[in-house]
Amino acid sequence: MRKYAKYLPFCLVVPFLAACSSKSTTSAKGKKIKSPFNYLSKDTNGLDILTGQFSHNIDDIWGSNELLVASKKDYVKYTDKYYTRSHISFEDGLITIETLGNQNHLRNSIIHTLLMGADPRGIDLFNSGDTPISKKPFLARQVKDQFGRDIINVAIANDFASHLLQRQLKTRRLQNGRTVTYVTIKMVADHVEVRARKYLPLVRKMAKRYGIETSLIFGIMEVESSFNPYAVSYANAIGLMQVVPRTAGRDIFVRKGMSGQPDRAYLHEPANNIDAGTLYLAILRNEYLDGINDPVSKRYAIISAYNSGAGAVLKVFDADRTSAFNRINQLSSDAVYRVLATAHPSKQARNYLNKVSKARQKYINIR
């Protein structure tokens, strides 16, 4: 489903800002070291200006009801001075590429979108330049051309673009009177699994490092981002496992002997993001929820806490931490699940436990 908003929320835009400055951080021993992490910018006035300019550009060209924005499971990139845009719904498995310009602009956007790489750090969603072409396209095996071929180079992508422009070109009228020319591309039926398998080596590595179930990591990744490495949310959660720098990020830094919090570029790197998300699961298990005895009950609590926080989970059972643990340990794992799925004050958290538990089942035997 396409997602439109009249105004682009500041918190949706900010996570895509590039953090280029280099800073020093302090290790647990007090030694100054060169850090690969940057701190969140304090120049909110500058960010407000950039956000306003970006929003104004889109409103002025497409109309106030046509501002399509990126989200956890949606990639959106504007090009050609904002007259062309590509939208990938990783949840629905649908790619829409549209332009207010001519077919050459549409062709170019098709090619660059299909051949873009997997590293979000090389993509600036604020400027209207083309996405760099990669020798290892992220969408490879997720999209097939008219002959069933994987789209892995410019020649195949250009041939497929010609096919789309000749056979599947459509138009629609905007409220401002302009005409949009567009094409839609369906991803393969198992596109979610194809993306998941891209991260199998990393997930196995982090699962072993922190003693977390592979299936749990995959289940959370699917629900959080549908394996969209470009993912960002309204809460400034970033990447595949939707890590929030100022909360989970700070906890993770403490355990790594670092000060501050990770920057967006760091968390957009898949290996870093999966490491951070999995470490946070281990923190929940070993520290915040360590008083739960039954491993299945603890898993349910961990899942719910990943979404709403450990404190909120314990308060479902009792306002007192010790009493909450005692109450949980008196219940069967099925009963713990029912309580969290029905009595948690957050509807999102209630649904989250159900979604992750179901998604996790699909990855128990992944090879």
Swiss-Prot record:
GO terms for biological process: cell wall macromolecule catabolic process; cell wall organization; peptidoglycan metabolic process. Keywords: Cell outer membrane, Cell wall biogenesis/degradation, Lipoprotein, Lyase, Membrane, Palmitate, Signal. GO terms for cellular component: cell outer membrane. It is a lipid-anchor. It catalyses: Exolytic cleavage of the (1->4)-beta-glycosidic linkage between N-acetylmuramic acid (MurNAc) and N-acetylglucosamine (GlcNAc) residues in peptidoglycan, from either the reducing or the non-reducing ends of the peptidoglycan chains, with concomitant formation of a 1,6-anhydrobond in the MurNAc residue. The keyword Membrane applies. Residues 1-19 form the signal peptide. It comes from the Bacteria. Its EC number is 4.2.2.n1. PROSITE patterns: PROKAR_LIPOPROTEIN, TRANSGLYCOSYLASE. PANTHER family: MEMBRANE-BOUND LYTIC MUREIN TRANSGLYCOSYLASE C, SOLUBLE LYTIC MUREIN TRANSGLYCOSYLASE-RELATED. Belongs to the transglycosylase Slt family. Murein-degrading enzyme. May play a role in recycling of muropeptides during cell elongation and/or cell division. This is Membrane-bound lytic murein transglycosylase C. It comes from Haemophilus ducreyi (strain 35000HP / ATCC 700724). The lineage of its organism: Bacteria, Pseudomonadati, Pseudomonadota, Gammaproteobacteria, Pasteurellales.
